[in-house]
Amino acid sequence: MKLSFIASPVWALALAQFAAATQVKIDVDVAIFGGGSAGIHAAIQLRDAGATVAVIEKKSQIGGHAETYTDPQGKSTNVGVVVFDNIEVASNYFARLNVSIVRGSPLGTAGPTYTYDFTSGAQIPAVNTSAEAQQQLTAALQSYSTNVLSKYPWIDEGFLVPDPVPEELTIPFGELAQKYNFTALMPTIAMYNYFTGDLSTIPSLYGIKGLGQGALKNLFGSFILPASGKTRDLYDAAAIELGNSVLLNADVVKVQRDVRINSTTTGVTVLIQQPGQPPKLIRARKLLVAAPPTLENVGAFDLTAEERGLISKFSSLGCWASVANVPGLNVTLKNYGVHMPYNQPSIPGPYGFVAYGSPNNFLVTVGLPDAANTAAKGEAVVRQSLATLSAVGAVPADALEKLTFPFSAVHSPYSLRVSAEEIKAGFYSKFLALEGARNTYWTGAVWAGHNSALIWNFNMGTVLPGLKKDLGL
């Protein structure tokens, strides 16, 4: 049979009519694109308000970066999201899903810790904990709180950048640290926010976002952790709650907005395909985009020129998280960038090999300069680091030969950001003005930072009030 015959107009029309006839139609109030932290939290809140939802998730499970690996002996570790800010929106959410919590610090490791520059192999002496160093840190904390955080009380609510944009939010964060004399705090910020990019050069808006009021309080106090130690518990509970409202392994084929979904209502249609199933056409009154807004992710959308222009401004880093099995290694090794500002691990590079109590298994997270080929690049970086450490005797000589990865996860694109020039030109005000336009709302880490509690804050304070109002809830 000739392909030209199948491709004729008559056959094309027949095939289109057949595809439409076999579609499964789903009518809901809100279609949610992305089943990570932002999308699942919003889904629960909307259901509680009486709305129907359909969560569209491309992976085989919900939860985004919240991954938990359990070894054959039953020892678990979180590979991605580890803790939650100890604020009301987080404790309320855990309570809503009946997931027990504890409060504490996750910064300890199992067994002794040694520090090396993973690039050169140089071993680093213990951190200075003298009284003078502590005084410098205390003074830096006070200055940061008084001169920076007090001026930007909205920082934990989202990128609610005012217009006009304060000039100091666009200068390099290292310059802001010098201006207000909180340089002694910068290594702590680097530790809490590894893989930010060069902390000395990123726009100050992003540096401040990484250590807002809530995080600062928790860093020197306590965080929320699931009582079981498994961050997956939150999403396992949510999955039970949402049931068949979650559509997994779903590829979005086409999204149309401002279209007639019935005789009286204008809304959105989302055509998805799942393996081994007929296509599904979701007809919704509103669309909530909770996945990273990259041109790749929203390629099936009917984007306006304005939306496409704004989304194209984003750049991102890459992040690869894994459990590495290194036989013979029984200590934690932390990466210390000798030649990096504030001694951040250089990118590309791992944060370290962090022991968590499972013999020979280590949590290893790698930062990359971009999101392309994350898994292959991440593994290569770990192997290069082990080769360097092996050469100086920090790990067994055969570590590289015996290295395996029983678990890994791609967390790219990571940390979507725009340039200082775009911030100055009002990028965030322009994008926030699109909330609700064309029956579409936007949420996620790109608006709140890679911090689940702050994402939920953004949902509760900015996204859900407008969305519920539009739905008449």
UniProtKB/Swiss-Prot annotation:
Which InterPro entries is this protein grouped with? FAD/NAD-bd_sf
Q: Which residues does the record list as glycosylated?
A: 98, 128, 181, 262, 330
**Coiled coil where?**
none
GO BP annotations, alphabetical order: terpenoid biosynthetic process
Task: Identify the metabolic or biological route this protein is part of.
Answer: Secondary metabolite biosynthesis; terpenoid biosynthesis
GO MF term set:
oxidoreductase activity
Enzyme Commission number(s): 1.21.-.-
What UniProt keywords are attached to this protein's entry? Answer: FAD, Flavoprotein, Glycoprotein, Oxidoreductase, Signal
Which Pfam family name is an example for this entry? NAD_binding_8
Q: What class of enzyme is it?
A: oxidoreductase
Q: Which cofactor does it need?
A: FAD
Write down the SUPFAM superfamilies for this protein, in alphabetical order: FAD/NAD(P)-binding domain (SSF51905)
Which domain of life does the UniProt lineage start with?
Eukaryota
Which purpose does this protein serve, as stated in its record? FAD-dependent oxidoreductase; part of the gene cluster that mediates the biosynthesis of the diterpenoid pyrones higginsianins A and B. The first step of the pathway is the synthesis of the alpha-pyrone moiety by the polyketide synthase dpchA via condensation of one acetyl-CoA starter unit with 3 malonyl-CoA units and 2 methylations. The alpha-pyrone is then combined with geranylgeranyl pyrophosphate (GGPP) formed by the GGPP synthase dpchD through the action of the prenyltransferase dpchC to yield a linear alpha-pyrone diterpenoid.
Q: Which PANTHER family match?
A: 4,4'-DIAPONEUROSPORENE OXYGENASE, PHYTOENE DESATURASE
Question: Which protein family is it in?
Answer: Belongs to the beta-cyclopiazonate dehydrogenase family.
Protein name in the entry = FAD-dependent oxidoreductase dpchF
